[in-house]
A protein has these predicted regions:
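Acidic/His-rich active-site region of diverse nucleotide-sugar glycosyltransferases
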Residues: 74-77, 99, 104-186
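Glycine-rich, basic loop-to-helix element that forms the pyrophosphate-binding segment
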Residues: 66-86
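A short, conserved alpha-helix in the catalytic core of glycosyltransferases
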Residues: 169-188, 192-220
């Protein structure tokens, strides 16, 4: 399927949740982009006076305040609907704790316009506090085990020599460019996830509809994960366990035996992560994983933590 067509009108959405300083930095980086944005939309998941004062009166910004915390998927969907209503050909999703260099968006657009079946593009993600450390060069996903990995995560590479557009299973939602045709084909982000794994789930659903996800390896973004929820907080561990299982159920290999293997493998992985995670007490971290596993088994989704 050839999905190439010019992406003339671009919109960017920044999601804020109790991180006004980060949000301002994200907005500033988008304003400086070489590639012009037709719409810059801020969705505030927890109405913040500082953000409102700085952005609500700015004629170049659409500031939207939600009545409650809708999570990453729900908050972004509020902005995506507005962007599509205004005629955007592609929508850039940007988490508040991410920033983009001036050339990032142009590289992402070029990757989508030059790749026959591409509908989603992401940059190389680097740590904002340690810029030589790579956080992700796209994701790999194994449907049999349900395991996912961020390519090259944790490696130190001051410069990334590859300039290719690489097909991957998914890209991080912290900076993700999605064409209008993808949204029209598969809908918006799945709000069952609320927080965590919604990006990979969206990419895998898009693949079923014939769209490829790519990493534009010449593009870079900087991200400091977990700023709004806590990098290794029990709540983050809860969502990681529950949503990993949910994704594996929806995008795993068929068969009862494979499903049982995936459940055991994913639970073991999340328990191991809780054991080595810094901060808080080990019993609290393990309870968070157990809670997430139990809620998955009980069919609890969304913001049911």
């Amino acid at each position: 399927m050839d999905t190439r067509h010019p992406l003339a009108r671009l919109a960017a959405i920044v999601l804020n949740y109790r991180t006004p300083a980060d949000t301002m930095a994200a907005v500033a980086s988008l304003r400086a982009s070489q590639r012009r944005l037709d719409h810059l939309i801020i969705v505030d998941n927890d109405p913040d006076d500082e953000c409102r004062r700085a952005l609500a009166g700015d004629p170049a910004v659409t500031y939207l305040s939600t009545a409650q915390n809708l999570g990453f998927s729900g908050g972004m969907n509020v902005g995506i609907r507005i962007a599509l209503e205004r005629g955007a050909d592609a929508v850039l999703l940007v988490n508040s704790d991410a920033t983009v260099p001036t050339d990032c968006i142009a590289f992402l657009v070029d990757a989508l316009e030059s790749t026959a079946d591409a509908g989603i593009a992401g940059p190389v993600i680097r740590s904002r506090s340690q810029p030589d450390r790579i956080a992700s060069v796209g994701m790999t996903y194994a449907p049999r085990s349900g395991r996912m990995r961020h390519r090259l995560a944790g490696t130190r590479q001051p410069s990334f020599e590859s300039r290719s557009v690489r097909r991957v299973d998914g890209v991080s939602g912290c900076v993700m460019l999605v064409t209008r045709r993808v949204f029209e084909s598969i809908g918006l982000l799945e709000e069952d996830y609320f927080y965590s794994f919604e990006d990979l789930a969206f990419c895998l659903t898009a693949r079923r509809a014939g769209f490829t996800t790519v990493v534009a390896e010449m593009a870079t973004a900087y991200h400091e994960g977990g700023r709004s929820i806590g990098a290794e907080s029990p709540r983050r561990l809860y969502f990681a366990a529950r949503n990993h299982l949910l994704l594996a159920t929806r995008h795993g290999s068929p068969g009862a035996l494979a499903a049982r293997w995936r459940l055991l493998s994913i639970v073991a992985l999340n328990v191991a992560h809780a054991v080595i995670a810094p901060g808080g007490s080990l019993p609290t971290r393990l309870r968070a994983v157990a809670h997430g596993t139990r809620d998955y088994l009980n069919g609890s989704h969304g913001n049911d933590a």
